[in-house]
Swiss-Prot record:
InterPro entries: ENaC, ENaC_chordates, ENaC_CS. It is found in: Apical cell membrane. This is Epithelial sodium channel subunit gamma. Belongs to the amiloride-sensitive sodium channel (TC 1.A.6) family. SCNN1G subfamily. Its main location: membrane. Glycans are attached at residues 213, 275, 501. The lineage of its organism: Eukaryota, Metazoa, Chordata, Craniata, Vertebrata. PROSITE patterns: ASC. This is one of the three pore-forming subunits of the heterotrimeric epithelial sodium channel (ENaC), a critical regulator of sodium balance and fluid homeostasis. ENaC operates in epithelial tissues, where it mediates the electrodiffusion of sodium ions from extracellular fluid through the apical membrane of cells, with water following osmotically. It plays a key role in maintaining sodium homeostasis through electrogenic sodium reabsorption in the kidneys. Additionally, ENaC is essential for airway surface liquid homeostasis, which is crucial for proper mucus clearance. It comes from the Eukaryota. A motif (PY motif) lies at residues 627-631.
């Protein structure tokens, strides 16, 4: 393009064109983009470089397309006259139900293993309280306390002596093994009573003494009730004996599903023992879980009420109860999730015999936010305690796993009532003679939160709870007992060879009271979406700024500014390098300046006219070799006038 044409095009480009006065559509659009409040259109024109202009065109067209799409949806929705009807039949998943007999093992089967322990227990009762148990069952043909024990120290009472303390005589106790003589008690005396509930204190208390192996540092545990002391002492030895029995043998000694579950109905349909899964509990024997996600299916119910839940009749068999291990008759039931471990001993509900127990459920689901909103955990993976249970994480599982791990570390064996950690064995006298003392000391530290388990374990973020409402009714009634008990006996077939009474049976009904499910969900008060929305509202209110404006700010203040600073620094670096290369390498003079110049040699006297004449003459001015330019060639008035003559403005109408 000729120089004149270039100047002409530049002048046209910079002419102030106003809206409708633009000569072409292109110039009109350009004027609109330069003067509109729509930021995207303006950036299309003023952005330098083809790539940036293409990006702004893409952003603007995308935004315009979204606007048309959303507006079209709003218009169509406004003029739509159709009606939508939703019919939803709600169903709730039925929880898992675990049922256990309170008595873990049939007494007729386990009696041989516990014969010596029971004999010493009866002898201790006779010596401590001065009475003998009245035999009321022909099946229990055990030996009573006899003088043959005199002079012989029994095994169980020798390991853990039973003592009677008189509150008036501190530090002394009566041991029946010493023929009633009082002896001094060394070590700590710990009274296991509640610090909250005040009970009447009797003058005499019963307890037992635990001593570490080959040590006199003993601990004596006393109880406000002799019943608690005898049962706790019996339970310690019972766990020691059963810990040495293989699991298969213990399963055979407990109740089978056919023996415990007589009849079963769910949601109006018949069920049987095949719908229950065996779960062996160390302290409750064989337990059976209904709806335990067998075959990866979970049963659900679509109606509320007792007719649409689980109905079972349980055979308790009171005749087979261990008299010292349990003092109540009935069963225990626990409602829980399918992947949850049933802590039947802690939160189970007891079922009475000769009663119909109805349990109405109401489901509540809770969902909590994890960190940073709370200290809960999703699945326990962030808790430094290994889950020794084959179940989903819960706070209770974490606490018991922590205690069992500490038990193995401190005592060298595992406590019988909890699962075994890897490469560990249950405690027993033969291999771990010191385990009882260690267990009680460790459990006391656990209750007082000295082991650190309570500070490490976290609550689960999501869990289900069933609020239970229990009601009781006498069952069977006096008029129906005459025919109902014979029918139940006939249903049991050859398994029962005696006449049953109502205390051998219990009826259980578990159902949803209604299908209303309550959900408790936590949500953050300030989310990312809300934060961006608040920012957008403030920017739009005070600066009429949008997302396009934010992109424009990023482009100008970050990309362009950084580019300019980088360019300037690069230019300065190039100039510095050029000056360094062009500068002559001047050498420093060898002596003082002017000392070797003969023209500067002066006398010590004042200067005279003669000495001034001896100075060299000043050099003459140099004449430039290049003549000055002809300034008349720089005058552009004539050329500029000729170029403006070729530019014509449109005629006014």
């Amino acid at each position: 393009m000729a120089p004149g044409e270039k100047i002409k095009a530049k002048i046209k480009k910079n002419l102030p064109v106003k809206g409708p006065q633009a000569p072409t559509i292109k110039e009109l659009m350009r004027w609109y983009c330069l003067n509109t409040n729509t930021h995207g259109c303006r950036r299309i024109v003023v952005s330098p470089g083809r790539l940036r202009r293409l990006l702004w065109i893409a952003f603007t067209l995308t935004a315009v397309g979204l606007i048309f799409w959303q507006c079209a949806l709003l218009v169509f929705s406004f003029y739509t006259v159709s009606v939508s009807i939703k019919v939803h039949f709600q169903k709730l998943d039925f929880p898992a139900v675990t049922i256990c007999n309170i008595n873990p093992y049939k007494y007729s089967v386990v009696r041989d293993l516990l014969a010596d322990l029971e004999q010493e227990t009866r002898g201790a009762l006779k010596s401590l309280y001065g009475f003998s148990e009245v035999k009321s069952r022909k099946q229990r043909d055990t030996e009573s306390w006899s003088p043959a024990w005199e002079g012989v120290r029994p095994k169980f009472l020798n390991l853990v002596p039973l003592l009677i303390f008189n509150r008036d005589e501190k530090g002394k106790a009566r041991d029946f093994l010493s023929l009633g003589r009082k002896r001094k008690i060394s070590g700590n005396i710990i009274h296991k009573a509640s610090n909250v509930v005040q009970v009447h204190e009797s003058k005499k208390v019963v307890g037992f003494q635990l001593c570490p192996n080959d040590s006199s540092d003993c601990a004596t545990y006393t109880f406000s009730s002799g019943i608690n002391a005898i049962q706790e002492w019996y339970k310690l030895h019972y766990m020691n004996i059963m810990a040495q029995v293989p699991l298969e043998k213990k399963i055979n000694m407990s109740y089978s599903a056919e023996e415990l579950l007589v009849t079963c109905f769910f949601d109006g349909m018949s069920c049987d023992a095949r719908n229950f899964t065996l779960f062996h509990h160390p302290m409750y024997g064989n337990c059976y879980t209904f709806n335990n996600r067998e075959n990866e299916t979970i049963l659900s119910t679509s109606m509320g009420g007792s007719e649409y839940g689980l109905q079972v009749i349980l055979y308790i068999n009171e005749e087979e109860y261990n008299p010292f291990l349990v003092s109540a008759t009935g069963a225990k039931v626990l409602i829980h999730r399918q992947d949850e471990y049933p802590f039947i001993e802690d939160v189970g509900t007891e079922i009475e015999t000769a009663m119909s127990t109805s349990i109405g459920m109401h489901l509540t689901e809770s969902f909590k936010l994890s960190e940073p909103y709370s200290q809960c955990t999703e699945d326990g993976s962030d808790v430094p305690i290994k889950n020794i249970y084959n179940a989903a994480y819960s706070l209770q599982i974490c606490l018991y796993s922590c205690f069992q791990t500490k038990m193995v570390e401190k005592c060298g064996c595992a406590q019988y009532s909890q699962p075994l950690p890897p490469a560990a064995n249950y405690c027993n006298y033969q291999q771990h003679p010191n385990w009882m003392y260690c267990y009680y000391q460790l459990y006391q530290a656990f209750v007082q939160e000295e082991l650190g388990c309570q500070s490490v374990c976290k609550q689960s973020c999501s869990f289900k709870e069933w609020a239970l409402t229990t009601s009781l009714a006498q069952w069977p009634s006096a008029v129906s007992e005459k025919w109902l008990l014979p029918v139940l006996t006939w249903d049991q077939g050859q398994q029962i060879n005696k006449k049953l009474n109502k205390t051998d049976w219990a009826k259980l009904l578990i159902f949803y009271k209604d299908l209303n499910q309550r959900s408790i969900m936590e949500s953050p008060a300030n989310s990312i979406e809300m934060l961006l929305s608040n920012f957008g509202g403030q920017l739009g209110l005070w600066m009429s700024c949008s997302v396009v404006c934010v992109i424009e700010i990023i482009e100008v203040f970050f990309i362009d500014s950084l580019s300019i600073v980088t360019r300037r620094q690069w230019q300065k670096a190039k100039e510095w390098w050029a000056r360094r290369k062009a500068a002559p390498s001047a050498e420093a003079p060898s002596g003082a300046q002017g000392q070797e110049n003969p023209a500067l040699e002066i006398d010590d006297d004042l200067p005279t006219f003669t000495s001034a004449l001896s100075l060299p003459p000043a050099p003459g001015a140099q004449v430039p070799g290049t003549p000055p330019p002809r300034y008349n060639t720089l005058r552009l008035e004539r050329t500029f006038s000729q170029q403006l003559a070729d530019t014509r403005l449109p005629d006014e109408p």
